[in-house]
Amino acid sequence: MSDVVVRRARFEEVRPLAAEYLAEQEVAFGRPTSPPLPQGGVFWVAEDTASGEIIGYAAGTLRPEGCTIGPIFTRENGRRRGTGAALLSAIETWVADTRVPVMEVAVNAENAGGVAFLRSAGYRPGTMMMVPEEGAPGA
């Protein structure tokens, strides 16, 4: 993890990675999933300290009752080197420091890798989010 630094970011900085995330989700699951909207948005990026390249990001939506984090995304060259863990750790520290009352992390239920990552970090399934079937109104 020492070769990755995490910092808060502006929406404009995460926009390119958000596009990569959506494209990857569409390939993996046959449909894109939407990251949180920028209203009330909080963002973090993970930078490779050697190259300065942004190799991951996390987004969250802040509400009076708490914060929903998701997605936590890393580029291929940021995977299996602690980038996701560094992002999650920075978010957890921020949540504690700012006294956000409730934090939850959203992950696509079909994303086995994402679910396994969060379980290994001490998270468990909680609230279920329902999405319309393909072709249904609102899909």
Show the residue positions of the predicted features.
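Acetyl-CoA-dependent GNAT
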Residues: 8-70, 75, 88, 131-135
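A cross-domain feature marking catalytic cores of carbohydrate-active enzymes
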Residues: 62, 107-109
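Active-site acidic-Proline motif in GNAT/NAT acetyltransferases
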Residues: 75-77, 81, 109-110
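Conserved active-site alpha-helix within GNAT-family acetyltransferase domains
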Residues: 85, 97, 109-127, 132, ...
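Actinobacteria-biased recognition of intrinsically disordered, low-complexity terminal regions
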Residues: 1-3, 138-139
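Conserved acetyl-CoA pyrophosphate-binding loop and the N-cap/start of the following alpha-helix
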Residues: 78, 82-90
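Conserved GNAT acetyl-CoA-binding A-motif
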Residues: 95-107
